[in-house]
Design a protein with these regions (language model features):
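Hydrophobic cores of alpha-helical transmembrane segments in multi-pass integral membrane proteins
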Residues: 28-57, 67-99, 106-132, 145-146
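Extramembrane terminal tails and long inter-domain/linker segments of multi-pass membrane proteins
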Residues: 1-26, 57-62
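Non-cytosolic membrane-interface motifs at loop->transmembrane helix junctions
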Residues: 136-146
Length: 146
């Protein structure tokens, strides 16, 4: 293609905003709902960890609820659960609106969101079971991060 043909190429027609919103409504709502659920879970686990810090004898017989595991779970739920889902949902909606075209295959986005949430859930179960590496800030078990 010559340079003249490239400049005269027809531009794809922009879709109506309602059509764009309808195409990405399902994945965006799922991502935002998942983010809200993870935010509530991170808050609950964080409060339980704070309680363990101030009252060490609380649930002392349960080895799965030590302060280190609860704190790591709270951060994973917040960073990867809440912030990851909310960021992906916002990015998906903004990119669809800014490019002026509806989302082509929303089923793939939903499948990716399900896999993302399954990975975060596997990471939280692994941390609770004690499968976390010793690196602060990266508490994800190997099977949940690869």
């Amino acid at each position: 293609m010559s340079e003249e043909e490239t400049h005269n190429a027809p531009i794809a027609p922009e879709a109506q905003p309602e059509e764009i919103n309808a195409s990405c409504r399902g994945p965006v709502l799922f991502l935002f709902f998942s983010a809200a659920v993870w935010a509530v879970q991170a808050t609950g686990v964080g409060l339980l960890g704070s309680l363990k810090m101030h009252v060490p004898g609380f649930l002392a017989d349960c080895p799965f609820l030590t302060y280190g595991r609860l704190q790591a779970n709270a951060w994973v739920a917040f960073l990867y659960g809440f912030a990851g889902n909310a960021g992906l949902g916002l990015t998906l909606w903004m990119l669809s609106r800014l490019r002026g075209m509806p989302l082509a295959k929303p089923g793939f986005v939903l499948a990716g969101a399900f896999l993302w949430n399954a990975g975060v859930t596997a990471a939280m179960v692994g941390i609770t079971m004690g499968d976390q590496p010793g690196m602060a800030g990266y508490e994800l078990p190997a099977y949940a991060s690869r």
